[in-house]
Amino acid sequence: TTDHCGSCTKCLEACPTSAFVEPYLLDATKCISYLTIEYKSEIPAELAGQFGGWAFGCDICNEVCPWNLRFAAESTVPDFRPRGDLREAGEDFFERMTEGDFQAKFADTPLARPGLARMRRNWRLAWASLRGAQRRAATERQ
């Protein structure tokens, strides 16, 4: 195999939950992508506050990777474009939704995988982590 990383550790340093135990070794139980998409229980409190607004998956490690950035390009496939209804969604977006509303809006999307209950959990944690980050930033400015 080819080692594209060399001595780079940008993904390890950028991961908000320290999911990378060491180079090339990811502890999925700390990974925001795993926790928000696959994990079925309550998210551990020590990780929940570190979501930085991520409610479904996380791309931080990919976004900082110099190798990946060489090939990064926004998709031209319409189905892969950001959905406006989520970009404009407020804090209670999923809380107000019924199961029928959720299915009508997201049955044909990856958000169907965690389902409404876990999206509610994730959405609450994402908003809470953003509020926490704002509080920390305000405190640091003082």
Model features per residue range: what roles?
Residues 1-13:
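Glycine-rich adenosyl-nucleotide cofactor-binding module
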Residues 84-96, 104:
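Alpha-helical adaptor scaffolds
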Residues 17, 21, 37-40, 129:
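Conserved helix-loop functional segments at active or binding sites
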Residues 33-57:
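Acidic/histidine-rich catalytic neighborhood
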Residues 97-99, 129-132:
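Alpha-helical transmembrane segments of multi-pass membrane proteins
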Residues 10-33, 54-56, 60-79:
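Iron-sulfur cluster-binding cysteine motifs and their immediate structural context
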